[in-house]
Amino acid sequence: MSKTTEIIRLTEQYGANNYHPLPVVLTKGEGVWVEDPEGNRYMDMLSAYSAVNQGHRHPKIIQALKEQADRITLTSRAFHNDQLGPWYEKVAKLTGKDMVLPMNTGAEAVETAFKAARRWAYDVKGVEKDKAEIIVCENNFHGRTMAAVSMSSSEEYKRGFGPMLPGIKIIPYGDVEALKKAITPNTAAFIFEPIQGEAGINIPPEGFLKEAYNVCKENNVLYIADEIQSGLGRSGKMFACDWENVVPDMYILGKALGGGVFPISCVAANRDILGVFNPGSHGSTFGGNPLACAVSIAALDVIIEEKLPERSLELGNYFIEKLREIQHPDIKEVRGRGLFIGVELHTSARPYCEKLKQEGLLCKETHDTVIRFAPPLVITKEELDWAIERVKKVFAGV
């Protein structure tokens, strides 16, 4: 029995069946390349759902991890630590916001935004107690916690987890008129993804982000952007909202914020919003821990110093152009921004992902019929050409 087979056997025997991974085991990674126990190399075209924008084991980020781990890793928020303040400042300046609240996972950050929006509605906007409403979009993916699941339009995500949280309205993605109709005096916030990742790399109609922003401003509704996947360079801009020069009231960040090395997430907003929290109203034992903050500072430095948003834009345009040259009856559409790309098929994407894996290219289906290509942003043009040849080969053979 191979090492790969044995590890998969153990995983399936003892692990809860809440994921459906491709049959590959990864033991090493560097840059855009990963390796299995038998020494086979693969190109990573998923980047851990955009958490590894800086590439696997970026030297600067790993060095920050090692140096901080040699000093102190966790203090809790009962005490100050020497990494949190500098990290706050870095994220505040990057987002242009007054305040930042740290958590660990993207779903926790979404939960934080949800709570902040509701409390803001009561304490600032003056909504009657327990009447606050949140507007979200169809086919969203904001995580797996109860608030996130309650916001989902997927019945499968909700099945068996009811009752759902009240006060949530779901509108079609990219529909400004539907947003206008959904708003009432009780509306606290509009929470959205500027590009829907899990839904299949869905890009809203041109002008939607700006128009929706204006509607929210006219109605005193918080405009909250979930940039967990689309942010930090993935879409070819620092934030996907930058495509329409929109600055949301609140950013929700995660994934690449930790450089693929240590989990860290946050929400960033001005004082009139995050000021609704007081000691004891929200928190996390690990949120803002010194190890995560040190890693995140280095992760953000890499994004800025290596101009990863600009790289993503240039190489993404090139990759999309090459993908669109592939002619095959199963291909319905190629779409994307930066290196955040979806190839929508007329059929299931899973068999294609399995065949690409056999050719040394790792990607994952999303929304059943979409192949998602989202490599680390440090990928080179030559490596993209290598990937294109594998994609062409797979489609030519099907």
Curated annotation (Swiss-Prot):
Compartments where found: Cytoplasm
EC number(s) recorded for this UniProt protein: 2.6.1.13
Record keywords: Amino-acid biosynthesis, Aminotransferase, Cytoplasm, Proline biosynthesis, Pyridoxal phosphate, Transferase
Reaction(s) catalysed (UniProt annotation): a 2-oxocarboxylate + L-ornithine = L-glutamate 5-semialdehyde + an L-alpha-amino acid
Pathway the protein acts in: Amino-acid biosynthesis; L-proline biosynthesis; L-glutamate 5-semialdehyde from L-ornithine: step 1/1
GO aspect biological process, one term: L-proline biosynthetic process
Pfam families in alphabetical order: Aminotran_3
Family: Belongs to the class-III pyridoxal-phosphate-dependent aminotransferase family. OAT subfamily.
HAMAP family: Ornith_aminotrans_3 (MF_01689)
Name under which the protein is recorded: Ornithine aminotransferase
Organism: Geobacillus sp. (strain WCH70)
